[in-house]
C-alpha cells in the first residue's frame, strides 16, 4: 500500500508518496520513464550500491535514466559541486525541459534542488530520499542550497519539487549512525508540535531504529504530515515555519566549527535541541521535569547530549550571529516552552545563553 500526502501550494503543489517497493507501482515508475530528459543526481556511494551493483529492485527503473554522481558528504555541499553538475548538463545539451531527480540524502537533495532552481532560470526536479533524515524532513518543503565556509546553508533558494518518493527499502542499506541522525529530526517534530507523539516515541523509538515496518511507516507519515501542515501556511519561512528550526542554530554552529561532515546533522540537532531546552528552563518556560524528559529521549536512543569538547560557549555565539534568523544583529532562537509547544524568542541576555550552553556541556541536573 502506498500512502499519498498532498502538499497544497497552489501552482507549486505536489504529492508525497510513502511506502515499501513503491517503484513497482506502474504509475510511479511511469513518472520516471516517460520523460527522456530526466537526469538523476546521486553520490558515489549510492552509485556503487545501487546503480553499479545492479540492485534488482531499484536498478530496473534507475538504469534507464541518465545519471551524474558527485562526492558524498556534507563537506561537498558547495558551489564547486553545483558547477560540476551544471557543466555536465550543458555539455550534454540539456535545456529547460529537463527533469532533475535527487537520489540520496539531504546533501544530494539540497544540491539538486538548488541546481534546479538556477539552471536556465529554473527546471523541474523530483526527490527520492534515501536516508531517514531526508525522508522525514529534508526532502519536503523546497529548501535548497549549499554551504559557505563561514556558515551552513548560506547560499540557497526556495524551490519546490514536483514530487517526493519515499521508499523505506532504501533504509535497510544504512548504517545505524545514519538512522540515528534521522531519529533526532523525528524527535524534533514531537517536541515542536505533539506531546502525544512524543510519548509514542518514548515507547517506540527502538522499533523505528530497527526498521520495524508498521512503526517506521507511521513515524515517517506523521512527520511528513506535520511538516506539510506548516509549509502549506508558511512556504517561505516568514511565520511559524521557523519553529522547524528548533535546535538548528546551535547545530549549525557545531557543524561549521568542527568542519562540515565531521558531525552528522542529526547528532548536532540533538545537542542543539538540548541546549535550547536548557535555555528555556533558565528563562523559566520549560519545567525541569520536561527538560529531563527531552534529554532522556535523546540519550536513551544513543544520540549525543553534549557538544564537542573543544568548542567553547563563546564559539557558539560567534557562529550563531551569522544565523539566518538574526535580524538587525539580534539573535532569535526557537525554544520549547513545553513538550509539544515552542516559541521564537529574541533579545536574549548573553550570560543566560552562555550558561545554557555550559549547563548542557556539564550535563547539569542529568547523571
Swiss-Prot record:
The keyword Ribonucleoprotein does not apply. Its cofactor is Co(2+); Zn(2+); NAD(+). GO terms for biological process: amino acid biosynthetic process; aromatic amino acid family biosynthetic process; chorismate biosynthetic process. GO terms for molecular function: 3-dehydroquinate synthase activity; metal ion binding; nucleotide binding. NAD(+) binds at residues 72-77, 106-110, 130-131, 143, 152, 170-173. SUPFAM superfamilies: Dehydroquinate synthase-like. It is found in: Cytoplasm. Binds 1 divalent metal cation per subunit. Can use either Co(2+) or Zn(2+). Zn(2+) binds at residues 185, 248, 265. InterPro entries: Dehydroquinate_synthase, DHQ_synth_AroB, DHQ_synth_fam, DHQS/DOIS_N, DHQS_C. Its EC number is 4.2.3.4. It catalyses: 7-phospho-2-dehydro-3-deoxy-D-arabino-heptonate = 3-dehydroquinate + phosphate. The keyword DNA damage does not apply. Pathway: Metabolic intermediate biosynthesis; chorismate biosynthesis; chorismate from D-erythrose 4-phosphate and phosphoenolpyruvate: step 2/7. Keywords: Amino-acid biosynthesis, Aromatic amino acid biosynthesis, Cobalt, Cytoplasm, Lyase, Metal-binding, NAD, Nucleotide-binding, Zinc. One of its GO terms (cellular component) is cytoplasm. Its main location: cytoplasm. HAMAP family: DHQ_synthase (MF_00110). Belongs to the sugar phosphate cyclases superfamily. Dehydroquinate synthase family. Catalyzes the conversion of 3-deoxy-D-arabino-heptulosonate 7-phosphate (DAHP) to dehydroquinate (DHQ). This is 3-dehydroquinate synthase. It comes from Buchnera aphidicola subsp. Cinara cedri (strain Cc).
